[in-house]
Amino acid sequence: MQFESDFRFDMDDSFSMCSQTLPCPSAGSSFSSASSAYEPFTPTSRRSTPNELSLDFEGAYNPFATHHSELTSPSGHMSKYMFGGPVKGEPEHMSFNEALPTTPMKKLDGMVTPDYDHMLEMNLASRHSIGSITPSGSFPMYTISPTTMGPTSFMMTPTHSLSGSEIAESTSSWSCSNESPISFFPQRGLGPLELEGLDMDRHPQSPLGTYHLHAPPSPGRLRAHRKMMVHEIQRKTNELQRAQIRASRKVSGSKSDGGVDVVRRAMCKCDYPGCHKAFRRNEHLKRHKQTFHGEGPNRFSCEFCGKDQFNRQDNLNNHRKLHARPNSRNRGVEFIPAAVPIIEQEERSRKRRAPPKSKSADKRVDDY
């Protein structure tokens, strides 16, 4: 399909469009035109209506929205300037109902090479079959016909606002290599919400650079993590101490179960013939000899029962008191009623000798 037009459009940036050849495929992936302009133009995001072509420029340009024509495309233009996609025999109506943006793109150098044309073919063969000029969910690039451009090449891209989901969906079409056409343009219009939609981990060579989605931990989280680690260390330390205590108890219990021979462990043995007593301490052995074998001075005897096995006065007094108390099953000292008044009299006389605590305290206060 070919459309010859003699219209001329004068813009602020010296944009002209003379004797253009407009190949219009019905299911192609791009739109090509021939122009001698040095600045690109950008179509808006609208779908087209089939079977007719109307270009409407509502801005500072001359409208020719009522110009409709049946378009046919020669095979030469289709094979040379179109990027993939079958061509329907049925003509298609492409309409621009909204004003074209007047934002010019910067001149691109070094793009008219066979490698770049091949790269455009790969990038523009996306999964969306574009029936109109306006893309939906991808970034197709529209180039002007190289027959009238000479040694330079210009590109026009849609400038409508895209959401984060559309950007994330369209990034797959630009993942061929680091020579993607998006790398020739400065990225200025992407906000923080749209940057979050881009998966930069899958495309580390993108000109947008690697975007770290994980923020550094906050001081509050660091303090909580440190506190949790300290608590865990204390818990493990307490468990280790309890395990050591249980192990020591088990060892001591196993020793006690085997039984202990007191005589064999005692080092102080009685040397009297026929006596096999042994004691752990030397004073116990000495007392044994004084009590049972008559060693040492100051031997004391009980006048109630006649026992003389006491080498100390306090031991004798304790024994005599037991005679003044009634008998019990677990006591081996016999109760003697005559010992009761004697023991009571000794207790009363002992109390008289001891000064009262209150008087002694008063005397100490007076002395100070």
Curated annotation (Swiss-Prot):
Residues 359-368 have a biased composition (Basic and acidic residues). GO terms for cellular component: nucleus. Residues 338-368 are annotated as: Disordered. Its main location: nucleus. Keywords: Activator, Conidiation, DNA-binding, Metal-binding, Nucleus, Repeat, Sporulation, Transcription, Transcription regulation, Zinc, Zinc-finger. GO terms for biological process: conidium formation; sporulation resulting in formation of a cellular spore. Disruption phenotype: Leads to immature conidiophores without phialides. GO terms for molecular function: DNA-binding transcription factor activity, RNA polymerase II-specific; RNA polymerase II cis-regulatory region sequence-specific DNA binding; zinc ion binding. The keyword Nucleotide-binding does not apply. A zinc finger (C2H2-type) spans 268-292, 300-323. Induction: Expression remains constant during conidiation. Both zinc fingers are required to induce development. BrlA, abaA and wetA are pivotal regulators of conidiophore development and conidium maturation. They act individually and together to regulate their own expression and that of numerous other sporulation-specific genes. BrlA, abaA and wetA act together to positively regulate the expression of the Pks1 gene cluster that mediates the biosynthesis of an anthraquinone derivative pigment that contributes to conidial pigmentation that provides protection from UV radiation, heat and cold stress. This is C2H2 type master regulator of conidiophore development BrlA. It comes from Metarhizium robertsii (strain ARSEF 23 / ATCC MYA-3075). The lineage of its organism: Eukaryota, Fungi, Dikarya, Ascomycota, Pezizomycotina.
